[in-house]
UniProtKB/Swiss-Prot annotation:
Lineage of the organism: Bacteria, Pseudomonadati, Pseudomonadota, Betaproteobacteria, Burkholderiales
Keyword Calcium assigned: no
Annotated S-S bridges: none
Source superkingdom: Bacteria
Biological function: Displays ATPase and GTPase activities.
Protein name: Nucleotide-binding protein BPSL0529
Keyword check for Amino-acid biosynthesis: no
Residues where ATP binds: G8, I9, S10, G11, S12, G13, K14, S15
Length: 297
């Protein structure tokens, strides 16, 4: 059975991800107590269901300590994938304010208070980060701070299409002016490269458009940086495999996330596609949804 566990921070998009999996034919359960999961998997397998998606968050805090061992045990019998959704505190506060929802932990007494004061939203978010942090190491992390819901749904569908027998390498382009991604294992700053933005004909385009591709591809310094990053990754990918890593996110950042970082992410994804299963995602570039997150084959 394929089991997808969705966890992370409240407000980071777990409901959106779960809905995307339901549309893909998964049997979906929100906030299932972890200890019930093995029994549910056995029951569904007996009933002929082969795809299960479960969202787990801090509302199950009493059982979160069981999750690492539970994931290992389930992985011996099933194809288990863990998706850990994260977002910046600022983005989460804005989302809770817009929806007027209450954070699951906001009604708990503050650890620092001698009386029964309720914690602030920011305190609740930070407490939840501590509770769910051990689960992050088991799956792929994705920063949804700057993701639209439709882009997240597209990315989740790409995520479940990946084979589970190899390390998945994700190249993510971004713009520093919108903040650094929280989900990056490695981050490369390419702002030292010539910027197509200063060419008025190239400014409205992206690193996916042929005129920008031609501009950057003609520069030796761009190829030097590409070669250096590729050499580093090719050297260290075997070590990550030996460490049983399932996912590795490489973030490529330029000023706005529109030209240079997009071109380099695309080029590196193509170069490394024979070394690993590859996903490329463009966080900040104004591109179509189907181009913002895709598999590289």
């Amino acid at each position: 059975m394929r089991i997808v566990l969705i966890t992370g921070i409240s407000g980071s998009g777990k409901s959106v991800a779960l809905n995307a999996l339901e549309d893909a034919g998964y049997y979906c359960v929100d906030n299932l107590p972890p200890h019930v999961l093995p029994e549910l998997a056995r029951y569904l397998a007996h009933e002929g269901q082969n795809r299960l998606a479960v969202a787990i968050d801090a509302r199950s805090s009493a059982s979160l300590d069981e999750m690492p061992g539970l994931i290992r045990a389930l992985s011996r019998e099933h194809d288990v994938r863990v998706l850990f959704l994260n977002a910046s505190t600022q983005a989460l506060i804005q989302r809770f304010s817009e929806t007027r929802r209450r954070h699951p932990l906001s009604g708990s007494p503050s650890h620092d208070a001698d009386v029964g004061l309720l914690v602030s939203l920011e305190e609740a978010i930070e407490r939840e980060r501590e509770l769910v942090a051990p689960l992050a190491e088991f799956g792929h992390q994705i920063d949804t701070s700057n993701l639209r819901a439709n882009v997240l749904r597209t990315w989740v569908k790409r995520f479940i299409e990946q084979k589970n027998d190899d390390l998945v390498l994700m190249f993510e382009s971004f713009g520093f002016k919108r903040g650094v991604p929280l989900d990056a294992d490695f981050m490369f700053d390419v702002r030292a490269l010539p910027n197509p933005y200063y060419d008025h004909e190239l400014r409205p385009l992206t690193g996916l458009d042929q005129p920008v591709v031609a501009f950057l591809d003609a520069l030796p310094v761009v190829h030097q940086m590409l070669d250096d990053i590729e050499t580093f990754l090719v050297k260290w990918l075997p070590h990550f495999r030996e460490d049983n890593r399932s996912y590795l996110t490489v973030a490529i950042g330029c000023t706005g996330g529109q030209h240079r970082s997009v071109f380099l992410a695309e080029t590196l994804a193509a170069r490394l596609s024979r070394q690993a299963s590859v996903i490329v995602r463009h966080r900040d570039a104004p591109v179509a949804v189907d181009a913002s997150s895709r598999l590289v084959t």
